[in-house]
Amino acid sequence: MMKILIIEDTPNKKTAIEEVIGALFKGTANHYGVTWAEDLNSAQRFLYTDQFDLVIFDMYLPDTKNIGLERDCSSELITVFSQSKNYNSEAIALTQFEISEVDNIQLFNKAGITLVNYDESNAWKTALELKLNRVAQKIKCDFLIFCALTKERAAFSDTEAVLGDTQNISGLDCQEIKIGDHYGFIVKPSEMGLVSMAIASSKAIELFQPKIVAMSGICAGVHGESNYLDIIVGKVCWEYQTGKWKDGEFKQEPMQASLDSNLKIDLEQSKDDIGLITQVRNNLFESELATMKIRIAPISSGSAVIADSTMMERIGSQHRKMAGLEMEMYSLYEAAAQSLCRPLYFGAKAVVDMGDSSKGDKFHDIGCLTSARYVSIMLKRQLEKLQ
């Protein structure tokens, strides 16, 4: 969701600014929230404590609302803006003075704040619309979910999340989703596998700048470490195909990606959360769900579909506690870990087969649903912490 801070205490001017913003985004998929600061103290507090996509400045404010007279606060505001986490945000100052009359115009220029005369003409509206359009093109969101299959994404329709329209955004197959008060997208790559997921997740994370990313779906289990319809959360994840062939023998060299330590604690605690497990199983009656467990365990990724018990044993030898095998999670973990915005990340997939010759699709639909429910619940909890 686009976040806008408006520093303004004049009622008529506030109304005019709101009308421009509302008219520009009416009927579009852009969600936005406005925070108002009507005095210097609250403006400084918001700039220091929160991050905004656009900051709209007024130069003259009282130090405290309803106490004292307005004064020129531009120097203080620019200093705080430049030192805060918003220093790189889009910014515009609307002043009723002629630009030529502003003494400290160089301060605005150095801080990257566009200074515009607020008058009866429409010039200031055009300038504000340009800023809003520039911010809208960045399309930031709170979270992203990645699903390799259409049925994995469709399963979110039976969760507490609210699904919206599908969109083609910069070549990405996206579907709008809202969890609680937070907006995001479910992104589906063009194909299954590590390569397509690496491309889609890297591109989406840099484009949308989310706070947290997740993956849901289905996977193969490992005998002795997981059972049908268990949900496997990737504690560590690696690609089992990396290594070197030498003298007819493949020597493995798996590179691991792991979870953030604080997030891992929350995920570990979820496996004993009876209320959460009840929500995941609600109105589902497969007998295997009676013994379903949430396992925070090692999971391996590879680009091939495995339906061979011998190959499963060979891959499983890379980690004695490996509980699952799937085709995309390692790509997401690495894309998130190496991105510029460094979001939190986790993946959760339900066991629907054991990667042997009996592989089938009996549990696909229910596996997609239980993993989607778990992911939506955990995302809601984490997003509330990240506000």
Swiss-Prot record:
Gene3D superfamilies: 3.40.50.2300, Nucleoside phosphorylase domain. Keywords: Antiviral defense, Hydrolase, Phosphoprotein, Two-component regulatory system. The modification 4-aspartylphosphate is found at residue 58. GO terms for biological process: defense response to virus; L-methionine salvage from S-adenosylmethionine; nucleoside metabolic process; phosphorelay signal transduction system. Its EC number is 3.5.99.-. Residues 3-123 form the Response regulatory domain. Probable response protein of the two-component regulatory system Detocs that confers resistance to bacteriophage. When the system (DtcA-DtcB-DtcC) is expressed in a susceptible E.coli (strain MG1655) it confers resistance to bacteriophages T2, T4, T5, T6 and SECphi27. Detocs inhibits T5 infection leading to growth arrest but not complete cell lysis, during SECphi27 infection leads to cell lysis. This is Detocs response regulatory ATP nucleosidase DtcC. It comes from Vibrio alginolyticus. The gene is dtcC.
